[in-house]
Amino acid sequence: MAGLLSTFDTFSSRRSESINKSGGGAVIPGQRSTVSVFVLGPSVTDDADKLFIATTFLAHSLDTDKQHSQRGGFLVSLLAMAYSSPELYLTTNGVNADVKYVIYNIEKDPKRTKTDGFIVKTRDMEYERTTEWLFGPMVNKSPLFQGQRDAADPDTLLQIYGYPACLGAIIVQVWIVLVKAITSSAGLRKGFFNRLEAFRQDGTVKGALVFTGETVEGIGSVMRSQQSLVSLMVETLVTMNTARSDLTTLEKNIQIVGNYIRDAGLASFMNTIKYGVETKMAALTLSNLRPDINKLRSLIDTYLSKGPRAPFICILKDPVHGEFAPGNYPALWSYAMGVAVVQNKAMQQYVTGRTYLDMEMFLLGQAVAKDAESKISSALEDELGVTDTAKERLRHHLANLSGGDGAYHKPTGGGAIEVALDNADIDLEPEAHTDQDARGWGGDSGDRWARSTSSGHFITLHGAERLEEETNDEDVSDIERRIARRLAERRQEDATTHEDEGRNNGVDHDEEDDAAAAAGMGGI
């Protein structure tokens, strides 16, 4: 019987291994598109010329009249400018089954009077039409940088910041767009500027060189459509992480940005390991969790087999990345999320209300996480030399911390709080009140929020967070009563003022009450 159980335990991992292993059949190459990439030749030595070419690449990448593959090629050309040998960079990181990069050199000929003396060429021939297409007049539909209203002026930027800083600022921002385009495409602009703030504070990106919102959206649209560009950037990260130690400042900044996309799309998998397995609670011995534990073990083996590219399997669209979805191990994931919402308050905003959520296991996870005995790791008792007295005191403290809190967290997706209040200053400090304070407004939760004719005062998400930090449970209920009382008084004043009109100037009360209810004010 033991042998039979062992066979079942290893079936999942062996099955996954056999599916993903190469069968040794004939290799039939697929169709590949050709992408033109432009690199600087040895005759381009002036910093002003280099920065002009960089901003030209950026402008072409935003041209909506061009195909996305062409626009992606200009972004590749821009990224390659960070290296002394762009050809070697593309040879090392640009091997891709979807595209074939064709490299053209840009040279500077002082005798040329048109196209600013630039000429596009290869070893054998020159390309006049391509040169005119690349360096000819081009109308920018929007400024590239926030510090400019018209086309980029390389001389001005170069004089202020210098070439390495300008090029580094541009390339770092392209990498930040990659991060946000992959992880939160719906909020690309907001996410980009939030992530950029750290680089602005340390001086990596100067204010005049910050991308405009239109530039961010344009680059993001190209990255979402050109998987070959994303693959090139990921391979760049892998190379920097594994093959080199003498990184430039720009490359170190790229590594910092790249850390934000490590394990992107694998949050459920990582959280299941962290809260479901590594906590090592007794619930893991349940028989209905065993299939999911075996599945998770198989996924861990698959993840480790990917080597340095493992953190990027979702970004690279590796065929196995769908196996890591929590729907493939729902019971264990549900249990882990129950533990998580108790142990980590930030996880209470994590989206747990999914169709495959096992409610019983979700509640079980919360129950064992709240249990004082389960919080003590027996594996560390001997190693740390914990005495029986110390363990008893620890159990006592844990029981006191969790005592009286028998409520369970419901599955939720979280959300910001923004409550429209009347145009009045509300003092949030607790104050004494009497039963008479509550007279004049009903106890019904739907009636206790007064309807007003204006909403000029808001509690925003930032204010709500500050309120949560500065108040305790008793303060919250007191604040709720006082806000309701103030609004009730204002409602009574409005009713007196508009008695002859019979209505409050056409205000949609239902909509306002619904907004307050949606913001959760009734449950403070």
From Swiss-Prot:
Keyword RNA-binding: yes
Domain of life per record: Viruses
Gene: N
Key words of the record: Capsid protein, Helical capsid protein, Host cytoplasm, Ribonucleoprotein, RNA-binding, Viral nucleoprotein, Virion
Region (Homomultimerization), start-end ranges: 440-461
Compartments reported by the entry: Virion; Host cytoplasm
Identification of the protein by name: Nucleoprotein
The organism's taxonomic lineage, starting at the top: Viruses, Riboviria, Orthornavirae, Negarnaviricota, Haploviricotina
Note: Most abundant protein in the virion. Since the viral RNA genome consists of 15,383 bases,there are 2564 molecules per encapsidated genome.
Region: Interaction with the phosphoprotein, residue numbers: 462-471
One Gene Ontology term of the molecular function aspect: RNA binding
Domain notes from UniProt: Ncore is globular and carries regions required for self-assembly and RNA-binding. Ntail is an intrinsically disordered monomeric domain in the C-terminus.
Similarity section: Belongs to the paramyxoviruses nucleocapsid family.
UniProt cross-references to InterPro entries, sorted A to Z: Paramyx_ncap (IPR002021)
